From Swiss-Prot:
Involved in the biosynthesis of isopentenyl diphosphate (IPP) and dimethylallyl diphosphate (DMAPP), two major building blocks of isoprenoid compounds. Catalyzes the conversion of 4-diphosphocytidyl-2-C-methyl-D-erythritol 2-phosphate (CDP-ME2P) to 2-C-methyl-D-erythritol 2,4-cyclodiphosphate (ME-CPP) with a corresponding release of cytidine 5-monophosphate (CMP). Its cofactor is a divalent metal cation. Homotrimer. NCBIfam families: ispF (TIGR00151). The gene is ispF. It catalyses: 4-CDP-2-C-methyl-D-erythritol 2-phosphate = 2-C-methyl-D-erythritol 2,4-cyclic diphosphate + CMP. Its EC number is 4.6.1.12. A divalent metal cation binds at residues 9, 11, 44. It comes from Alkalilimnicola ehrlichii (strain ATCC BAA-1101 / DSM 17681 / MLHE-1). Signal peptide: none annotated. One of its GO terms (molecular function) is 2-C-methyl-D-erythritol 2,4-cyclodiphosphate synthase activity. This is 2-C-methyl-D-erythritol 2,4-cyclodiphosphate synthase.
Amino acid sequence: MIRVGQGFDAHRFGEPGTPLILGGVQVPHERGLAAHSDGDVLMHAVTDGLLGAAGEGDLGTHFPDSDDAYKGIDSRILLRDALQRVRAGGWRVVNVDATLIAQAPRMNPHVGAMRDHLAADLEVAPSAVNVKATTTERMGFPGRGEGIAAMAVVLIARDGFFEH
C-alpha cells in the first residue's frame, strides 16, 4: 500500500536580526520568520505532509504552538519525531517534493543543503527529496515581501511494499 500526503505552511517575517531558517539551513536575510518554533516553513510543510500521508493528523495537533515545550524548537527535531510516529505505523518515506514560495531571498543557492538536511532527517537518499523555489511574481503576501510559504507532497509506502 502507498499513501500520499500534502503539507503547507506560511509565516510572516519577524523582527530584523532574527535568523531565517529554511530546510534546516540558515539563509542570509535581514529578517527571519515570526513563529513559536524556529519558523522553518519548509520543515513544517514536509512534516505536515508526512503526518497527513500516514493519517496521523497535522503539525499543530502533535506540536501545538500553545505548548512551551516547542518554543524556539529546531523544526528538524519535529520532523524526526513525526518520522518515528510514521515508522511505528509500518510506513517508510518513498519520496518528497517540496516548494518554497518567496520573493526574497534567493533560495537556489541553498536548496541543495536543504535537500540534504531533509534526506538525512527522513533517512532516505538525497535523490528521494526534491526542493525547489519560486516567486509569485510580486503577487500576494510572499510577492509583497511579507513572508514565506512552503508546500510539500510526501509519498510513503508500507514496509516491504516495493520488494515484491
